[in-house]
Amino acid sequence: MEKIYIVVVHQVEDFAELALSAKPFSSIDKAKEYFNSIVEDERSNANKKDWEIETDTDVCFCAFEEGRYTENHSFVELREEEIN
């Protein structure tokens, strides 16, 4: 039987320092709560740094410094994963 887990993926690269995490949840409500708190922080940081916010939806947030995406960006995604 397949189980579906909700995963929040959070990646931040700031001047070539990479931080990546993937946190699983069995509850969509808890995953959304965690996702929203991370996005709130990342949105605030992006605005302070004058980064371009490319995507800001219920399941994805992406922001980056203009012209320096590979060095300075933030990405947060809420997604479902099937585990066999």
Language model features with spans:
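Short aromatic-glycine-(Arg/Gly/Cys) micro-motifs in beta-strand/loop hairpins
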Residues: M1-L20
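Residues marking helix boundaries in flexible regions
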Residues: Y5-V7, D29, E54, N84
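Short, flexible beta-strand-to-coil junctions
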Residues: V8-D14, S27, E65-Y69
